[in-house]
A protein has these predicted regions:
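N-terminal module of bacterial RNA polymerase sigma factors
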Residues: 1-30, 180, 185
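A short pre-motif secondary-structure segment
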Residues: 135-139
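Structural recognition of an alpha-helix C-terminal capping motif at a helix-to-coil junction
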Residues: 33, 47-54, 69-81
Length: 185
């Protein structure tokens, strides 16, 4: 499979919309969830996602493959900047995505229990400070290394480790308040 870096550099050189579409398909879901951490509204997150890719298409910001960090961290940085500009304009507060759970009658008990735990996890995440929620999302959902998270969030590496530690402690307390004491992280 071709790397994101190669696809974007080819797109920047040749203007082939298929390359940009391939990148959108690869990163759509992750970016939407990331952007939902900034805005409370799925429509706003979708709009910010499209703005991010429009910026890639029209402005063609200079991705430098020789600089440290991956295409993914660069893309998330652009999305983050778009989200922060959006927040400044509209002054929204953040809320995480509430996951749709299928009808209970159609699911086995184990799936229902997992769905309920996930719902409680999202609910607990919504009580965290936005910076804790973002750092935990990038670390555990996007599986990004601390160095990339630092670049995306505009922090140094020690600050990222500190936020992860504080975020995990806050999440544990929130889950305990909800009656979940067996959470592993």
């Amino acid at each position: 499979m071709e790397t994101d870096e190669k696809i974007y550099l080819r797109y920047a050189a040749e203007d082939d919309d298929a390359d940009l579409e391939a990148l959108l398909i690869r990163h759509r879901d992750g970016l939407l969830l990331f952007l939902l951490g900034f805005v409370r509204n799925a429509e706003d997150a979708e709009e910010l996602l499209m703005d991010t890719f429009a910026k890639l298409a029209v402005d063609k910001p200079g991705f430098e493959p020789d600089r440290p960090g991956s295409f993914t961290s660069w893309l998330y940085t652009i999305a983050r900047r778009n989200a922060l500009m959006h927040i400044r304009k509209r002054r929204y507060e953040t809320v995480p995505l509430d996951e749709d759970i299928p009808s209970e009658s159609a699911l086995p008990d184990t799936v229902l229990l997992k769905a309920e735990k996930n719902r409680k996890l999202y609910q607990a995440m919504s009580t965290l400070k936005p910076e804790y929620r973002r750092v935990l999302y990038l670390l555990y959902i996007e599986n990004m290394p601390h160095e990339e998270i630092a670049g995306i969030m505009g922090l140094n590496i020690r600050q990222v480790y500190h936020l992860v530690d504080r975020g995990k402690k806050s999440l544990k307390k929130a889950l305990e308040r909800m009656g979940i004491t067996d959470a592993r992280y």
